[in-house]
């Protein structure tokens, strides 16, 4: 740096002049650094936004729905597929079309229940999966809308389910011994392989990184679904249809925990 001395000024005055000048230069440099850092942060923010939007666009692409998504469904913590009817028609389909000899069938003791089945594929089913399916059967039954917090659920073998003439669609006669459980009505919801999955909490903890627990409450299902949708989209950086969330939730009002 070249310095010019003003001979009309004292040494102290010359020094003060260059000191003030250097301070102004430092402020300019500091300002430039601050502007650069701010610009870099803005660029990073834009990049993150771009990546997020790209993920959203990717998730918007129409995915092929699995056959079981027309029913209540979940994968147990032991990775067994469990499906249940949503109404008389789908109960009828679950039993007549998808129930196989080695499956385990569930229903509540009270009327107004889905027929749930564990698709065993001939494998031994752990007690945990049986408990989870019983809880799902209870939670997706009319007991939820009636405000009942626990209800009896039985499980049976497929050969105990009899189709008899004169019974309404989705209704079957049950013969023989029933194995009973009395689960609490409670579920959770998360994303499993790009699909909204609503199931007992133990299943969701096993398969989903982020989730919400739900119980019977006083929030309208449609309003709760909007909150759940927002949570899932933010946590999983994905796009999910509101109708998909609505379809997997139990009927009736909800409390989100």
Predicted regions and their residues:
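Extended, highly charged segments
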Residues: 1-257
